[in-house]
Amino acid sequence: MKRYRHTGWFGLVAIAVLMVSTSAMSNAQSAQHPQWVGTWAASPMLALDGRAMRPFAAVTLREIAHVSNGGEQVRVRFTNEFGLDGLTIGDAHVALSGGGSAIKDGTDHALTFGGASSVRIPPGAAIYSDPVALAVPALSDVAVSFYLPSQVMRGETYHAFADQVNFVADGDVSGAATLPSPTELKSWYFMDGIDVNAAEGARAIVTLGDSITDGALATENANSRWPDVLAARLKQEHGLENISVLNEGIGGNRVLNDQAGPSALARLDRDVLAQDGVRYFIVLESINDIGRLARLTGPEDEVTAPMLEQGLKQIADAAHEHGIKAFGATLTPYGGAGYSSEKGEQMRKDVNNWIRTSGTFDGVVDFDQITRDPQNPDRFNPLYDSGDHLHPSDAGYKAMGDGIDLKLFK
């Protein structure tokens, strides 16, 4: 049993002085080491085919990221996760985008890495730039430019579907106001995150999913994916304006098996648990696992509803172990899609029923109810169908983002 003795007035004064000193030290440390929160993210994957892989030699890439939270300092995360050789970045800059390949006057800042202007990222690794003072408005476009000198490059790390035009130009033109004679790119290469210094109460939502989260068939450069719609709504909601949304969708992704990028289970640590400031996440995955039932290529494709439910439960349980609230999103209709089947449709309904009723999640986002045709619930509402009967249109993405109950984040 602990024993206590009277401290007297001198002891109380000493304790008070210690508390003030500790508080001052804590405030000083906080000022020196700001809290970071992710404001933009893209899930990296391996570029395998000749269309995706590029002969990046002595060129500058300028990649555009639509951020959610704003801040007064920014840092950029570069990745060589799938490279078999070290990746050298010879020069890097960050600025506010001026549209196209242009940057806004007076916003260009050189990035450094431990004080150096260049860095070599080992195979399988990622690295943050040093923080730089740049006032980044919420919901703005940031341009990150980096020079790749000639080097051996086996295995390129990228995010295939950017739904955003990026640029590449010859030579080291990272600080150019506008890139000279650029070529357009439709992917993000070697960059998978941007953080800002956090305002009080800042935190992040991660959206983990497939092409429906990635924004397939949404209007290019319009930032009309459902996570974008959610991010814009949060900025208008008192008390939630400092919540960012990190889109970790990969087109073609699956829960249980690698297909396009690592499976949701395999990338959970990287894309959800390790994100700076994450407090919530929404998972919308399984439709590609289900779709494979119509196109079996091996025994691993023969999934069942209980298998998918167990995979989703593992994802939710891992989030809970890290103090993150997990929200399950029901699977949107896919009747009439190229890989739809009667067996798959029944499985979709079974998984959706489990998401709604199992109690696994801290809340449910019922995208199925939001997007389905009231007259034919196995199919998308025609108002929300992109035309392929699998992916939403811009109007469908907006309905999804608008249909999320913001009370989940209060």
Where are these regions (language model features)?
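Oxyanion-hole/transition-state-stabilizing segment in secreted/luminal serine hydrolases
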Residues: 218, 250-306
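Structural recognition of the beta-strand scaffold that forms the well-ordered cores
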Residues: 204-209, 213, 243-249, 279-285, ...
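Glycine- and acidic-residue-enriched helix-capping/strand-helix junction motifs
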Residues: 215-228
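Bacterial N-terminal signal peptides
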Residues: 11-21
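Solvent-exposed loop/turn segments at secondary-structure junctions
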Residues: 82, 150-151, 211-215, 250-255, ...
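Bacterial N-terminal signal peptides that target proteins for export
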Residues: 2-13
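N-terminal secretory targeting modules
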Residues: 2-3, 24-208, 218-221, 239, ...
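Catalytic His-Asp segment of secreted/periplasmic serine-dependent ester chemistry enzymes
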Residues: 265, 291-293, 331-410
